[in-house]
Design a protein with these regions (language model features):
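Extracellular jelly-roll beta-sandwich "head" domains, especially the C-terminal globular C1q domain
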Residues: 1-115
Length: 115
């Protein structure tokens, strides 16, 4: 996979599992957080939602941690035009976590078969 301006390009054609894992921490009174996978078959002229997940949190001022995942199967028939990108949305005051030693917030691509 290569990435440019947040858009991921596949290294070869094929059927892929695309997974988006998000870990975060609420720092205030945010009530929800969401993650989404978008895909295009026309090099970004239009984008379709491939997977969406939302997590709700108890509306208290204390810190709260959350994890969510969304996954989709994507048929990449042309590496020049078929791409994916990722999006996160939060009401307010959410810190997304990352780590160099383990996958906390990450994208996972698995080639499953030929197209």
């Amino acid at each position: 996979m290569t990435v440019s301006s947040g858009v991921f390009t596949f290294p070869s054609t094929g059927i892929y599992s695309v997974q988006f894992n998000v870990t975060g921490k609420r720092n205030g009174d945010s009530r929800y957080i969401g993650c989404q996978i978008y895909g295009t078959a026309n090099n970004g002229t239009s984008w379709d939602s491939l997977g969406l997940s939302y997590e709700s949190m108890d509306n208290q001022s204390a810190e709260a941690y959350m994890f969510m995942r969304t996954e989709s199967i994507f048929d990449c028939t042309n590496t020049s035009t078929h791409k994916v990108k990722f999006y996160v949305n939060a009401e307010a005051n959410v810190t997304f976590t990352g780590d160099t030693d383990r996958n906390t917030t990450c994208m996972i691509f698995k080639r499953l078969a030929d197209t």
